């Protein structure tokens, strides 16, 4: 198993402005559904070998808070921190970015528990 990083991991979280979930959620005022945001986050987390090994096959979302709506074309970054050892919960945050890369808000935050963790 790869070693658990000691600090936060941060990645761009690109979601296409023409993502198929936008037109129906909501017509005329499209926002990204929370379930899509979480699915994209999980895919990003699984691309990191250490995070994927820590998560296991069936991690549990133990807490999620949706703070700011994500509009089509909005730039996002995801950051998460894994706890030391095999148990515990990873904390995550998905941030909204300005064109210059500066954080302008938080779209979502929460915790994910590794498979089999108490």
Predicted regions and their residues:
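Hydrophobic beta-strand-centered segment that forms part of the acyl-chain substrate-binding groove
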Residues: 42-82, 89
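Compact, glycine-rich, soluble single-domain proteins
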Residues: 24-33, 37-46
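Hydrophobic residues in beta-strands and at strand termini
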Residues: 13-15, 66, 112-114
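Short amphipathic beta-strand and strand-loop transition segments with alternating hydrophobic
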Residues: 1-4, 79-83
């Amino acid at each position: 198993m790869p070693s658990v990083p000691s600090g936060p991991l941060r990645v761009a979280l690109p979601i296409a402005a023409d993502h198929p979930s936008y037109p129906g959620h909501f017509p005329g005022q499209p926002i990204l559904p929370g379930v899509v945001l979480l699915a994209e986050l999980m895919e990003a987390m699984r691309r990191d070998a250490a995070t994927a090994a820590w998560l296991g096959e069936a991690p549990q979302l133990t807490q999620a808070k949706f703070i700011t709506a994500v509009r089509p074309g909005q730039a996002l970054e995801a950051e998460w921190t894994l706890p030391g050892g095999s148990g515990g919960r990873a904390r995550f945050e998905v941030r909204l970015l300005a064109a210059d890369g500066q954080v302008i808000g938080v779209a979502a935050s929460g915790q994910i528990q590794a498979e089999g963790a108490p």
